């Protein structure tokens, strides 16, 4: 089998990359605020998973979904939480 497999073929017209990036941009504010040690860990793991394993932001968000949801709720960041839940419901 020489053709590569695109696991996101069904998301072709859903702008999953743009939507994931917008969530990551909003999460960056939490990373920079450094109010919880998880955020530094998350930023480090994101870089590692992207660089070493080639994972995209949608997959990384999926990997940390329960923790992200809890922290966003605790921080009252309901807009980012809503964006994350939309990704989960429609693309994960």
Swiss-Prot record:
Highest rank taxon of the organism: Bacteria
An annotated GO BP: nitrogen fixation
A Pfam family the protein falls into: CowN
Keywords of the record: Nitrogen fixation
Record function comment: Is required to sustain N(2)-dependent growth in the presence of low levels of carbon monoxide (CO). Probably acts by protecting the N(2) fixation ability of the nitrogenase complex, which is inactivated in the presence of CO.
Classification via HAMAP family: CowN (MF_02117)
Family: Belongs to the CowN family.
Protein name: N(2)-fixation sustaining protein CowN
Protein's organism: Rhodopseudomonas palustris (strain TIE-1)
